[in-house]
Amino acid sequence: CSRKAVLLKAEIDFLTNYLALEQVYSHRFQYMVSAEGEVHRIFVPPLLFLPFVQQAVIQIYSQPVFGSIDLNFHVNGNEIQFVCSFDNGNLLHPDDFSKIRQRLKLLYGNDYTLSVAKRTIMLKLKIQKP
């Protein structure tokens, strides 16, 4: 995508389609995507959340048992909270996200928080509304 920003709603739709496509090739997981707040009025950089979702899919594929992935987006004022969690797979390690942290730092400076714990990724962003 050559745009600098896309609607959060479009990004959520893209991630939903990505998970549906992954599920076509492997019926090893189910997923749920939920969104609260004004996702149709907030802009974010394209593909901002994709690396987190890809990491969850990779971890699910690493296990021989059926798993699930949950994505939750919550917009409150000028804050976005994104939570990606999965119930099977290897445990996550914060060092796995060093390049993503670099991108977030370039985009948001100190206006973000990224937490990685076991099988959950939480990203909080403070955004500038146009």
Predicted regions: what they are:
Residues 1-126:
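Two-component histidine phosphotransfer core
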